């Protein structure tokens, strides 16, 4: 069978990107266009000749547009096998004309349910019925019908029609049909996941089933190590579609590596704890913070963060919660850093920083999603959990010692707690006046993490005396707390919950420490 010339097209899109220009070109090629609702209105207002779908069906759109394309004259025109005499005869007998092209994208269900204030009724109204039905009919009959779901394919389809006497090639129609079934399967899975979530609302159990699709965005030179192959993928699940380019723009430098991506995730995850607050700087190495500080100016915050550990930042990643200014950029330029991440770059800063070709400069365009599922792959299955996005406020703190913390201690404890959440367990973090003094990360023993944090402070020449200490989990024994007291800390923030809490509290009282419980643990593996 030769490639069928496209004579009649059915167009009905929610995302109207590029649709006017596309249909204008179709019309110029002599294609007869039929459309519905808002799409029809936009086409006609743009001077494009298009007829209502009702001229095919002989039936009006009803029930607020819920029923408009579910009709035998539509689906018969799509599904008829063109070289089947019985199909052709039945089509003629029933006044059915063939439809050669379907251009449809679906109601934005995933985007709708991703909104924090979406109602159940709003979600239900964004379940597309007619769209998937037309897409599936057209895709099934891809031998004869061209089906387009993505505006990114408009130019390709038009170019092919121009070079192929108004027809698309068989290979193209098959590729477009495959995209349809990928789209509709994901769409249905998103609806099912939402309804499962609605049914389980208020329950603490994970969903009974989750559909996850990974779409490769780029190949990477290698993975965590040179002998490992790797790629970066767009994640599509019941909570929507998300990828690096949705949140960031790489403005300068080499391609991002596997490890770069991990570090960017760690850096932005922590710096967003300070979104909307005074200038804050986060310095990351191997996904752990080696220096974090907050100050009245960005350059002061950077200098404080850098002074926590003046060796580890070399080759590290630095993230800022406010636009990067020239004074801070010049200070940062004194050392080699892999990546800088900022919500904006002030005039002249990019030009200055781009003089070092190997430095990557990243713009964070919008906040990361917080209420999304987190996936961790193992060799024997997938672990799924809510992101650790819950925030502890001052009102949540429970003072468990005789001495109450003063305002500065409270400020430093809250600051330290934000950081401890983002450090590999076991975690001990010392903070003083809005600056990390020492960070102990990833040790099998909490007391060892405390020792490392203390030694890092000593190496940097920073005084722990009067600092606040945060522990990501409870102190199982008093030894960790006593180590902090011996180092000079005066306040402690920890989850509590140990069977030896009374012993730990007594040790705090004996050493005149102010201690608060958060009742929330922040293990990070």
From Swiss-Prot:
Pathway: Purine metabolism; IMP biosynthesis via de novo pathway; 5-formamido-1-(5-phospho-D-ribosyl)imidazole-4-carboxamide from 5-amino-1-(5-phospho-D-ribosyl)imidazole-4-carboxamide (10-formyl THF route): step 1/1; Purine metabolism; IMP biosynthesis via de novo pathway; IMP from 5-formamido-1-(5-phospho-D-ribosyl)imidazole-4-carboxamide: step 1/1. Keywords: Hydrolase, Multifunctional enzyme, Purine biosynthesis, Transferase. InterPro entries: AICAR_Tfase_dup_dom_sf, Cytidine_deaminase-like, MGS-like_dom, MGS-like_dom_sf, PurH-like. It catalyses: (6R)-10-formyltetrahydrofolate + 5-amino-1-(5-phospho-beta-D-ribosyl)imidazole-4-carboxamide = 5-formamido-1-(5-phospho-D-ribosyl)imidazole-4-carboxamide + (6S)-5,6,7,8-tetrahydrofolate; IMP + H2O = 5-formamido-1-(5-phospho-D-ribosyl)imidazole-4-carboxamide. The keyword DNA-binding does not apply. One of its GO terms (cellular component) is cytosol. GO terms for biological process: 'de novo' IMP biosynthetic process. GO terms for molecular function: IMP cyclohydrolase activity; phosphoribosylaminoimidazolecarboxamide formyltransferase activity. Belongs to the PurH family. The IMP cyclohydrolase activity resides in the N-terminal region. This is Bifunctional purine biosynthesis protein PurH. It comes from Prosthecochloris aestuarii (strain DSM 271 / SK 413). The gene is purH.
